[in-house]
Swiss-Prot record:
InterPro entries: Protohaem_IX_farnesylTrfase, UbiA_prenyltransferase, UbiA_prenylTrfase_CS, UbiA_sf. Carbon 2 of the heme B porphyrin ring is defined according to the Fischer nomenclature. PANTHER family: 4-HYDROXYBENZOATE SOLANESYLTRANSFERASE, PROTOHEME IX FARNESYLTRANSFERASE, MITOCHONDRIAL. Its EC number is 2.5.1.141. Converts heme B (protoheme IX) to heme O by substitution of the vinyl group on carbon 2 of heme B porphyrin ring with a hydroxyethyl farnesyl side group. Its main location: membrane. It comes from the Bacteria. This is Protoheme IX farnesyltransferase.
Length: 307
């Protein structure tokens, strides 16, 4: 198969394997999304949600998020080719054609929606589809190349997984479920701007208006600190609504303190006139993922053990 015009050549085998199609789904990105889905199911059930439902939601959730990743790679294949981090993706390298990728991504989304509708709840299916459309249409097609608010608004796509899990168990969405949505919404800029600071030159070269590219490092670290504060405040509010107890509260305080501490280290480093270095940005980037994972675990354990 000859790579399409304008797409770089590759020394890799021309026949795509199942591993290449798996790479289209962005499995590393999906792991944290799926984690918030499954832990939200335990929170909603206040116990074991059932093996069958866990399997269905896990598979359907992966396929829906994977489908979004596929269409993101299709749309962004021109800029992916020009960025070191993404140049070898199957679509940008020409290993998998746009047509084949679109068929694969579409099939994943249809299967996901059908599985959730039939074996979970219709609301879970709609929430999953909403997340897909937010990521592909709102973020990738509209915001990513046009505004530095891309991560803030488009990041809402990553907030839907816990709603999917909650709706799969209960068939509705209460206020606590929307708090889970809001926590991820305000957490997202902290996580992705820490990454953007490290690869802002690549974003600049391909014309993506990430915050560090448009407004510089100082405003970026200030915004990271602000969103970290929002995240921590939101994380403890469900305690005062009676949705979670002392175990979650203590966990949220400790985890939140560490998130603020790492944000402060990055803020102080940049405001002192230093260039962003991996040794100060990477700890925040990596810890932010651990923070979200453990916060959701704390919520699940608290509601399961303490009722």
């Amino acid at each position: 198969m000859t790579p399409p015009s304008g797409v770089g050549h590759t020394t890799r085998p021309l026949r795509a394997t199942w591993r290449d199609y798996l790479a289209l789904t962005k499995p590393k990105v999906i792991s944290l999304l799926l984690w918030t889905t499954l832990t939200a199911m335990f929170m909603a059930a206040r116990g074991w949600p059932g093996l069958g439902l866990l399997v269905v939601v896990s598979l359907a959730g992966y396929m829906s998020a994977g489908s979004a990743g596929v269409f993101n790679m299709i749309i962004d294949r021109d800029i992916d080719l020009r960025m070191k981090r993404t140049a070898t993706r199957p679509t940008s390298s020409g290993l998998i054609s746009t047509r084949d990728a679109a068929i694969f991504g579409g099939a994943l989304q249809v299967l996901s929606f059908g599985m959730l509708w039939v074996w979970a709840t219709p609301l879970a299916a709609w929430m999953s589809l909403a997340g897909f459309l937010t990521y592909v249409v709102v973020y990738t097609l509209w915001l990513k190349r046009n505004t530095w608010h891309n991560i803030v608004l488009g990041g809402a796509a990553g907030c839907f997984p816990p709603l999917v899990g909650w709706a799969a168990v209960t068939g509705d969405l209460n206020l606590f479920a929307w708090f889970l949505f809001a926590i991820i919404f305000f957490w997202t800029p902290v996580h992705f701007w820490a990454l953007a600071l490290m690869i802002k030159d690549e974003y600049r070269e391909v014309g993506i208006p990430m915050l560090p590219v448009v407004h510089g490092d100082r405003l970026t670290v200030a915004q990271i600190g602000l969103y970290a504060i929002y995240t921590v405040v939101l994380s403890v509010m469900p305690v005062f609504l009676g949705e979670v107890g002392w175990l979650y509260f203590l966990s949220a305080l400790v985890l939140g303190w560490l998130l603020l501490q790492r944000s402060w280290v990055l803020y102080r480093h940049v405001m002192a006139g230093n260039k962003v270095e991996r040794k100060v940005a990477v700890p925040l980037y990596l810890y932010s993922m651990l923070y979200l994972a453990l916060l959701f675990v704390a919520g699940a354990v608290d509601r399961v053990l303490l009722g």
